[in-house]
Regions:
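Acidic, glycine/proline-rich low-complexity segments that act as flexible tails and inter-domain linkers
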Residues: 1-58, 86, 112-142
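Mid-chain, well-packed structural core segment of small domains
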Residues: 62-65, 69-95
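A short structural micro-motif
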Residues: 33, 69, 87, 100-107
Length: 142
């Protein structure tokens, strides 16, 4: 699979949110079995939903974190903690999102989420997160 086989708008948004390194790894690992799924998520999740004008990316990241904490999907949560930093959320805001979600998703889900967030934040030196220099309003244009 190559970039040219994926939805261009979805691929652009996916790269902006997750970073080139992550997206390149995902594309490189694509097999004939997973190719339809890569096409689907790039078109539907990134090209349609994440590109909509109704919410900025910072808000979408907050919602995504809460959903992933609830679902207890640690691999996806790790990826989206990084995306949340890239989209301008602070470590303190990420902590508050997990704490707030604990009320509705349960303490075990939040406990696992805090462990994932702590690991990601320890891997990211302070001030080097993409959003550290000031979050840019990245609302998608129509």
């Amino acid at each position: 699979m190559t970039d040219s086989t994926l939805d261009p708008e979805g691929l652009r948004v996916r790269r902006e949110v997750l970073g080139d390194e992550h997206v390149d790894r995902a594309i490189a690992r694509t097999t004939p079995l997973t190719a339809p799924f890569q096409e689907f998520i790039t078109r539907s999740a990134w090209g349609d939903v994440w590109a909509r004008p109704g919410l900025d990316r910072r808000t979408r990241s907050a919602i995504t974190l809460a959903a992933l904490v609830t679902l207890r999907v640690e691999g996806e949560l790790e990826m989206h903690v990084r995306a949340a930093l890239r989209n301008g959320l602070t470590p303190e805001e990420i902590s508050e999102i997990i704490l707030h979600t604990a009320l509705y998703a349960g303490l075990p889900a939040a406990n696992g989420a805090f462990a994932v967030a702590q690991r990601v934040l320890e891997e990211t030196p302070a001030g080097t997160e993409p959003g550290a220099t000031g979050a840019v309003d990245q609302r998608s244009e129509g």
